[in-house]
């Protein structure tokens, strides 16, 4: 009887841990999604890259996106 109870509790613990891990993986932000400078919510191998937008010399805010770590974008010379 004790073996059945122990086995049931162990199985319940394993299922709970698998469910928590799956929920944590779904909480990260995927590539290309809007982000803040909080790097904790990035999926693996992604970082939050931000830039400031200007229109006619007036700042229009900051935009941040999830991109692969180490990738840099630059303005193309005209």
Swiss-Prot record:
Gene Ontology CC entries for this record: extracellular region
Keywords recorded for this protein, A-Z: Disulfide bond, Secreted, Signal, Toxin
Pfam families per record: Toxin_35 (PF10530)
MF (Gene Ontology): toxin activity
Residues of the signal peptide: 1-22
Annotated propeptide span(s): 23-26
Protein name per UniProt: U7-lycotoxin-Ls1f
Top-rank lineage group of the source organism: Eukaryota
Free-text description of this protein's post-translational modifications in UniProt: Contains 4 disulfide bonds.
Tissue: Expressed by the venom gland.
Record flagged with keyword Secreted: yes
Species for this entry: Lycosa singoriensis
Family: Belongs to the neurotoxin 19 (CSTX) family. 07 (U7-Lctx) subfamily.
Compartment(s) where it occurs, according to its Swiss-Prot or TrEMBL record: Secreted
């Amino acid at each position: 009887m004790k073996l059945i109870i122990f086995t049931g509790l162990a199985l319940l613990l394993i299922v709970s841990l698998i469910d928590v891990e799956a929920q944590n993986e779904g909480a990260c932000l995927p590539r290309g999604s809007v982000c803040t400078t909080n790097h904790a919510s990035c999926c693996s191998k992604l970082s939050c890259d931000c830039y400031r937008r200007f229109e006619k010399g007036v700042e229009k805010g900051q935009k941040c996106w999830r991109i692969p770590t180490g990738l840099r974008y630059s303005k193309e010379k005209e």
